[in-house]
Protein backbone atom coordinates (compact mmCIF):
# COMPACT_ATOMS: atom_id res chain seq x y z
CA UNK A 1 0.00 0.00 0.00
CA UNK A 2 1.94 3.08 -1.19
CA UNK A 3 -0.10 5.59 0.85
CA UNK A 4 0.32 3.84 4.19
CA UNK A 5 2.11 5.79 6.92
CA UNK A 6 2.65 2.75 9.13
CA UNK A 7 5.25 1.05 6.90
CA UNK A 8 8.89 2.10 6.64
CA UNK A 9 10.11 4.72 4.15
CA UNK A 10 6.75 6.51 4.01
CA UNK A 11 8.43 9.91 3.42
CA UNK A 12 10.35 8.64 0.40
CA UNK A 13 7.16 7.07 -1.02
CA UNK A 14 5.25 10.34 -0.62
CA UNK A 15 8.11 12.30 -2.20
CA UNK A 16 8.18 9.86 -5.11
CA UNK A 17 4.40 10.11 -5.60
CA UNK A 18 4.60 13.91 -5.40
CA UNK A 19 7.34 14.02 -8.04
CA UNK A 20 5.40 11.64 -10.29
CA UNK A 21 2.29 13.81 -10.00
CA UNK A 22 4.23 16.74 -11.48
CA UNK A 23 5.19 14.75 -14.58
CA UNK A 24 2.11 12.51 -14.86
CA UNK A 25 -0.95 14.71 -14.16
CA UNK A 26 -4.29 13.24 -13.27
CA UNK A 27 -5.94 11.52 -16.22
CA UNK A 28 -9.28 13.00 -15.16
CA UNK A 29 -7.99 16.42 -16.26
CA UNK A 30 -7.18 15.26 -19.80
CA UNK A 31 -10.68 15.24 -21.45
CA UNK A 32 -11.68 18.70 -20.10
CA UNK A 33 -8.33 20.16 -21.15
CA UNK A 34 -8.70 18.62 -24.62
CA UNK A 35 -12.23 20.07 -24.94
CA UNK A 36 -11.03 23.50 -23.82
CA UNK A 37 -8.23 23.39 -26.38
CA UNK A 38 -10.69 22.47 -29.15
CA UNK A 39 -13.02 25.30 -28.11
CA UNK A 40 -10.18 27.85 -28.02
CA UNK A 41 -8.90 26.75 -31.44
CA UNK A 42 -12.41 26.99 -32.89
CA UNK A 43 -12.88 30.52 -31.51
CA UNK A 44 -9.47 31.59 -32.78
CA UNK A 45 -10.13 30.16 -36.24
CA UNK A 46 -13.54 31.82 -36.42
CA UNK A 47 -12.05 35.23 -35.62
CA UNK A 48 -8.68 35.14 -37.39
CA UNK A 49 -9.09 32.63 -40.22
CA UNK A 50 -12.31 33.31 -42.14
CA UNK A 51 -13.29 30.99 -44.96
CA UNK A 52 -14.15 27.39 -45.63
CA UNK A 53 -12.81 24.64 -43.38
CA UNK A 54 -14.06 21.73 -45.49
CA UNK A 55 -12.43 18.36 -44.99
CA UNK A 56 -12.35 17.77 -48.76
CA UNK A 57 -10.84 21.12 -49.71
CA UNK A 58 -8.86 19.63 -52.63
CA UNK A 59 -12.02 18.46 -54.39
CA UNK A 60 -13.11 20.63 -57.30
CA UNK A 61 -16.82 21.41 -57.43
CA UNK A 62 -18.63 22.82 -60.45
CA UNK A 63 -21.37 25.41 -60.01
CA UNK A 64 -24.56 24.66 -61.89
CA UNK A 65 -24.56 28.01 -63.71
CA UNK A 66 -21.05 27.62 -65.11
CA UNK A 67 -21.29 23.94 -66.15
CA UNK A 68 -22.69 23.17 -69.59
CA UNK A 69 -25.86 21.14 -69.50
CA UNK A 70 -25.81 17.61 -70.86
CA UNK A 71 -27.25 18.45 -74.24
CA UNK A 72 -25.32 21.62 -74.87
CA UNK A 73 -21.58 21.06 -75.01
CA UNK A 74 -21.58 17.83 -77.04
CA UNK A 75 -20.66 17.80 -80.73
CA UNK A 76 -23.27 16.27 -83.02
UniProtKB/Swiss-Prot annotation:
GO cellular component: cytoplasm; membrane
Tissue: Brain and interlimb region.
Membrane-topology annotation of the record: Peripheral membrane protein
Written domain comment of the UniProt record: The Cys-rich domain is responsible for the localization of the protein to the membrane ruffles.
Domain of life, source organism: Eukaryota
Induction description: By FGF signaling.
Localisation: Cytoplasm; Membrane
Described function: Inhibits fibroblast growth factor (FGF)-induced retinal lens fiber differentiation. Inhibits TGFB-induced epithelial-to-mesenchymal transition in lens epithelial cells.
GO BP: any one term: regulation of signal transduction
Segments forming domain SPR: 1-52
Name listed for the protein in its UniProt record: Protein sprouty homolog 1
Disease involvement: Overexpression during skeletal development causes a severe chondrodysplasia in which cartilage cell differentiation is inhibited.
Keywords: Cytoplasm, Developmental protein, Membrane
UniProt keyword Flavoprotein, yes or no: no
Entry-linked InterPro entries: Sprouty (IPR007875), Sprouty_domain (IPR051192)
One Pfam family it belongs to: Sprouty
Record family assignment: Belongs to the sprouty family.
Amino acid sequence: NPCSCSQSHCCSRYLCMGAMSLFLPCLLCYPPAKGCLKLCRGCYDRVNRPGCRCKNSNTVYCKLESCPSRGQGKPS
